[in-house]
Amino acid sequence: MVSSVLRDARRIVVKVGSSLVTNEGRGLDEVAIGEWCRQLAALVRGQGGEPREVIMVSSGAIAEGMKRLGWSSRPGEIHELQAAAAVGQMGLAQMYETKLREQSMGSAQVLLTHADLADRERYLNARSTLLTLLRLGVVPVINENDTVVTDEIKFGDNDTLGALVANLVEADALVILTDQKGLYTADPRRDPQAQFVHEAQAGDAALEAMAGGAGSSIGKGGMITKILAAKRAAGSGASTVIAWGREPDVLLRLARGESIGTLLVAQTQKNQARKQWMVDHLQLRGSVTVDAGAAAKLREDGKSLLPIGMVAVEGDFVRGDVIAVRDAGGTEIARGLANYASAEARLLCRKPSAEFERLLGYAAEPEMVHRDNMVVLGAR
């Protein structure tokens, strides 16, 4: 199965942990980061196959900050952790920028918190930014914004962030690079009878019992956080691979279809997962009515909804809220995330995108609802 899952994946989120990035806390591992960046660049360029879109979620800011500050053990005080993150993030960003630039590849630093992805408007802004970066051929390097939040430092981990980013951009696969070969039935460092798990279903409750609390002392996450991250990623249809980050050419070989590490398979197809989320779980905040031409484009071609095709707006909603799209007869034909608030949408009805800036003073997007953020109900 791994051969088809990773070989066919076109949008991949790669998460690499603190113990790998910082060589078990001894400082940023320049050689290893350079190797991952070389592989990321090769994937983006389509070496040996189709071009891929890749996002790197990298731990290491706190660990690098500890090293720069001369601390040998992880402090318990939140403000000290935040200070370490602020110091370490400088070096982390510089290293990725340098190593990706050596591959003639652009990079972008994106710092997120879980709150950014819980708020609909900020979620939509983050998604739009990341998709634009991918379209430009830039590699986003994402980390949690540990300097300004506390819960993520105390209880969170970048395995979870990697899964949330996979949900955010509708990735085909999440690759978690760790200091372990993959998942075992027990901790192999303590149990010589532990068996390696080559493949399982993401979300299988038995996996959590297997994972236990095994993990390094440098970062916050053990294997259990990776199991839970795979379960979360599967919610949007992304399968997860857990593999040893120092395996030679691990990313390129996975992309070629080699069986490396543990594959946790998502049981829900990506499009089905998004439809279920959009249709069944998000509360409608309003609706727009469209003319016959726009309705036909949505039903038949799955096109984005442009304001020029809208004839009426109902309800009170803000950017990022879920709205229904109805035809002239009142039948709901789609629903999706609004790019404009209801008051703005009323001004944009029947207007071409060239007039948006004159009417609003700015132009966010040319679409009222982008097709990537829309579910056509007739296609359920």
UniProtKB/Swiss-Prot annotation:
The UniProt record gives the binding positions of substrate as 59, 146, 158
EC number(s) on record?
2.7.2.11
An individual GO BP term: L-proline biosynthetic process
> Which residues are involved in binding ATP?
15, 178-179
State any GO CC term. Answer: cytosol
Question: GO MF annotations for this entry?
Answer: ATP binding; glutamate 5-kinase activity; RNA binding
Compartmental location: Cytoplasm
Pinpoint the PUA domain residues: 285-363
| Catalyzed chemical reaction(s) | L-glutamate + ATP = L-glutamyl 5-phosphate + ADP
**EC top class named in words:** transferase
**For this UniProt entry, which segments traverse the membrane?**
none
Q: Which domain of life is it from?
A: Bacteria
Q: What is this protein called?
A: Glutamate 5-kinase
Organism encoding this protein = Acidovorax ebreus (strain TPSY)
Instruction: Identify the gene encoding this protein.
Output: proB
